Amino acid sequence: MMKMRWLSAAVMLSLCTSSAWAFSIDDVAKEAKTLAGKGYEAPKSNLPSAFRDMKYADYQQIQFNHDKAYWNNQKTPFKLEFYHQGMYFDTPVTINEVTATSVRKIKYSPDYFNFGNVQHDKDTVKDLGFAGFKVLYPINSKDKNDEIVSMLGASYFRVLGQGQVYGLSARGLAIDTALPSGEEFPRFREFWIERPKATDKRLTIYALLDSPRATGAYRFVIMPGRDTVVDVQSKVYLRDKVGKLGVAPLTSMFLFGSNQPSPTLNYRPALHDSNGLSILAGNGEWIWRPLNNPKHLAVSSYAMENPQGFGLLQRGRQFSRFEDLDDRYDLRPSAWITPKGDWGKGKIELVEIPTNDETNDNIVTYWTPDQLPEPGKEMNFKYTITFSRDEDKLHAPDNAYVMQTRRSTGDVKQSNLIRQPDGTVAFIVDFTGADMKKLPADTPVAAQASTGDNAEIVENTVRYNPVTKGWRMILRLKVKDPKKTTEMRAALVNGDDTLSETWSYQLPANE
């Protein structure tokens, strides 16, 4: 009898849950599947030339009027503000509010915005539509709403946790990244946002994705906190065959850092939103790949089955590593993808694109499955994205991790004690970790290292680092053809015991 009562309660709970909202991801999926069966219609811009041709400084003058934040008059900790169209944000997106009883379009009004010195005709913008939206929440202080989510442009979105500033971005989907045919950028064309209650600590957003060769339905559950976590569910439909599908893509920027110092004199030791790709492979191996700003497009691939996690991290958060008071790269979040369920066979790819300045996002990573269904068939992906400054949680708890990677001109000390370059490239890699710090300084730690065909190792030494209470690996290579990339891998061992994650690196061509 007790079991029957429990089942009845569960059924009632299910019914109450399903009827609590007038909308679900299945509604978006129906629309996405219908769209996939039709020809693609490119979005049409309705933007007056005064807004389309404006410069960035002019666009920055258009500010949302905070007093008119959506849900200001509702008892909810979440508020919405909207982005005006302008520059290359020149096509409107539809934004809807979902309640328990209705789905209602949020209408554009120029009264939402302060236009600064931007001259415009009010009649031409009265039905313009929004470019995107942002979510505000009292994440840092109970009496102040701060931005925690920004959804603007293509399928990009940025998310913040407590005490963080915007850095890298996530995307809904990537298509044909780094292929000669050129990348296709899907866009979120419509959003549905559930109006949260006063006690809600999470916000649910649905999105309809569209592009020439794919459509998709997305559900994002935003859970703000010290680490803000986004629970993602997607249902993707191909319109046509694609060369490569990028699932759970992350986009970041790396201009220079300790492994690739600035080519010009700069007071900043490093300038990047992320400095490495971290991977937890399906077999349990942890891999750390420092990022580069190459002179030519570079792609690195890590084949595996059922990845357990991957992300672009900002390891090393001391202000002295960046010295930038304006842009605070030390406060920019890492993003970690945790897949749910089995993703099958495929690979994690890292794409590095040359850039001369920090305004260009030149780093992309994603999961790309080996097998794709026929057009019209549904693909399901579930995962979480954690936006964090606690990188100590994002490596193996019982193994050492790479603290820093430095690159140098290789040299040899002469009999007169003067160092002379010997035509090699040297890598200085510091490993540290809680368990490693417990090892005696005379532990016989060694490095298992290997390179691709384009180099030979001329020095592989490991020494105790009393400053970090870890071990430093010095790897010196003779590169055969500098016009080609050079691959290398290494891990610290003590006999048969592996002590560290795998350090994986690609020396760019012409470096």
UniProtKB/Swiss-Prot annotation:
One of its GO terms (cellular component) is outer membrane-bounded periplasmic space. Residues 1-22 form the signal peptide. Keywords: Periplasm, Signal. One of its GO terms (molecular function) is catalytic activity. It comes from the Bacteria. Its main location: periplasm. Pathway: Glycan metabolism; osmoregulated periplasmic glucan (OPG) biosynthesis. One of its GO terms (biological process) is beta-glucan biosynthetic process. It is found in: Periplasm. Involved in the biosynthesis of osmoregulated periplasmic glucans (OPGs). This is Glucans biosynthesis protein G. It comes from Klebsiella pneumoniae (strain 342).
